[in-house]
Amino acid sequence: MTDICTRVAHNLRVAMAHADIKTAEDLSAASGVSVYSIRNYLAKASTPSLESLAALGLALGCTPNDLMGWNTDEAA
């Protein structure tokens, strides 16, 4: 789980920078995901649910796959 938490935290920070969203509060306002949850994701304390990934991706202009670090170009 730690590797997933680390990957999500990193990808979330990168996506926030690309979207020019500077704080967890700003991302919360844009996504509807609680500030508490976003802070936990950034602190590598938990991973987002599918619903949260979708909302965060929509707010950040990316996909849940981008946030999870899943490469959709690779063959299964």
Model-derived regions, located:
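A short, Lys/Arg-rich alpha-helix, primarily the initiator
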Residues: 1-25
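Short, charged recognition helix plus adjacent turn
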Residues: 2, 40, 58, 68-76
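The alpha-helix within a helix-turn-helix
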Residues: 16, 28, 57
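Residue-level detection of the helix-turn-helix DNA-binding "recognition helix"
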Residues: 17, 43, 72
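Short alpha-helical DNA-recognition segment
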Residues: 20-40
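Residue-level signal for the short linker/turn that defines the boundary of a DNA-recognition helix
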Residues: 21-23, 48-51
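DNA major-groove recognition helix of helix-turn-helix/homeodomain DNA-binding modules
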Residues: 51-66
